[in-house]
Amino acid sequence: MRKRIVSCAMAFLMAFTLMPCAAFAGEASAEGQVESLEAEKPAEDDAFGEGGLDEAFFAEDEDSLIGTLEADEESAAFAVSAVTGIYLDQTHGNDANDGLTKDTAVRTLEKANELANANGTRDIFLASVYQVTGTENWDLGGKTIHRYKLGGYMIELKDASASLTLKDVVIDGAEYSVAAENAAETDSIIKAASGGTIELKSGAILENNKAAQFGSGILAINGVEITMEDGAVIRNNTNRNYELGGGILLGNGSTFTMNGGEISGNTANGGGGVAIIGSTMVMNGGKISNNSTYKTTGQGSYGAGVYVADYANASGGDILFKPKPASFEMNGGKITGNKALDYGGDGVKKSL
């Protein structure tokens, strides 16, 4: 009986020794780190069997590291590396790279998504503006694209032929790794200044951006068409310099059809949620809520939810607004909880 108990115990120890294991990192940088650990020779010389053990392993939880376990009869070595995200640089990247650091960034989103899946990460770091020149459909299964040491716009539609559809992707405009004094260089998450089409579907989220001027979430001028569906969200975006359109700015004959989704928690001088300048918005559903305007000195703030104006006496950089008719039509949905801190228009403000 005693021999049987000892035999069972040894069998359990052998099975446990051969099991894949996860190594946990106390701290990891955005560009990864490598750590080696040495284990002493096991008590039983034949614990690993003949030929040793060489087995790749990974863990699915956030604190675990991907790596390789190698062992022979003398020792066991664990080499692990933290993969915190894949780096995407359309300007300087190369799809032959591994994408694990900024210096080895890949060039296309398709490759970045492929490597993110292979490495078990849900984060992609955007290191240069991504230009859309044709038709692109981004469905990333809930992954997040972060702004990484990137000033200006994150995504730019180059001309009227450009079309971008977003589904199940979070685009986070918060600067991932940059000194606070450089943060003022950032601008809109999406810029479309020469026409084009933008469609936001379920799971598309634009958030946490701070723009120097207009349209912190989306800047759309000169005939851009935007559609927003159920499950899409534009939230927590801000214009620092008291400009227009915390969530979206429409200008110069652009159109926005809101069939569903939510625009919330955005802030601007005018149009905390949406600013419609010489353009058209039709709201069929969804919610515009908890947006706000700044209280300024010497300059009024207005239209916390939606601001509508035939033209704006404003320009900046390559942005120039032209006098055009503006309209807002509400057929459904809700506008609630917005707050204008100066000239009024908590929900909708029309300015001629």
Where are these regions (language model features)?
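Right-handed parallel beta-helix
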Residues: L140-T144, S163-E175, T197-K210, E225-T238, ...
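Periodic glycine anchor positions in long extracellular repeat architectures
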Residues: G203-A204, G215-G217, G231-A232, G245-G247, ...
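C-terminal segment of classical bacterial N-terminal signal peptides
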Residues: F16-A25
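Glycine-rich repeat segments that build the extracellular carbohydrate-interaction surface of secreted
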Residues: I86-Q90, R107-Q131, E136-G141
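Sec-dependent N-terminal signal peptides
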Residues: K3-F16
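Right-handed parallel beta-helix/beta-solenoid
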Residues: G26, E31-P42, D46-E110
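Short glycine/acidic-rich loop motifs that flank beta-strands on beta-rich extracellular proteins
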Residues: T121, Y148-M154, A174-D187, K210-S216, ...
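Extracellular beta-strand-rich solenoid/capping regions of secreted or surface-exposed proteins
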Residues: L115-N117, Y130-G141, H146-D168, D172-E199, ...
